[in-house]
Amino acid sequence: MIRSASFRAIGATALLGLGLGGLFASACRQKAAPAPPMATPSVTLSREKVPLGGPVDITYKFVVAAGATFTQNYRVMVHVVDPNEELMWTDDHDPPVPTTGWKPGQTVEYTRTVFVPVYPYVGDATIQVGLYGQPNQPRVPLAGEDMGQRAYKVGRLQLAPQSETVLSVFKDGWQAPEAAEHNAAVEWHWTKKVATLAVKNPKRDSVLYLDLDNPGGVFEESQQVTVSTAAGTPLDQFTLTPKRATLRKIPLPAAALGADDNVDLRIAVDKTFVPSRLSPSSKDPRELGVRVFHAVVVVLAP
């Protein structure tokens, strides 16, 4: 009886071992080796603490793996998430050099200026980067900390209250604000021939980030834009081409801003237009100059 019982126990153990071995072998066969990373992403920020609504220059860098070959063009996915991994905003974009032009071992580096949305949150945020193609395709494997679905953690950003930015007010010479039909976060003001931006004088060397365009369609002529102080001190002059968004980073020396607590900056254009006079289908009687999306003063670090 003991021998028989021992036999049955040994037989059951052997069968169990064979069964588990088969399961492990099957699992090993089913689990594919991870795909090798195609590149290593990283970002560098011009400043790590940014007030809501303020600009930050983000330098993206991709170090292409030695054996990597990109056979299609991918977009760069940029997600900014809060500590609970909730998505706050995105900055997806096409890299200036299409990924089919990336070479093994090459370093691809470029800088974009992002204006932080006025989001109902202040505190730490995480920047995630990825590469994606068609909607149903998996994202490209990259080297780094995968936060899920090949979204890789590349940096952190501290969001500060909007009150920490230099106060500026659209004073005179502006049309009422407008917003994009399908994205209320995209807002702009049209100028008239001369528009005044009232700024609380930082009394330090600063930079005016002026983000503007002429969308074209109705008015297709280039415009000369001049930025100066109310006292007439010239700060910048440039040509604005229709259908081409322009970001000007205009130096504001403390000496040019003067000693008053507030200073007016003037944006003047040489040509304005009235849509209803140029297009029979338009009923817009306003005088329009250029379309300004952002006009933000940033104090330079000491």
Where are these regions (language model features)?
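Bacterial N-terminal signal peptides
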Residues: 11-22
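C-terminal luminal/periplasmic domains and tails of membrane-associated envelope-modifying transferases
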Residues: 28-302
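N-terminal secretory signal peptides that target proteins for export/translocation
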Residues: 1-8
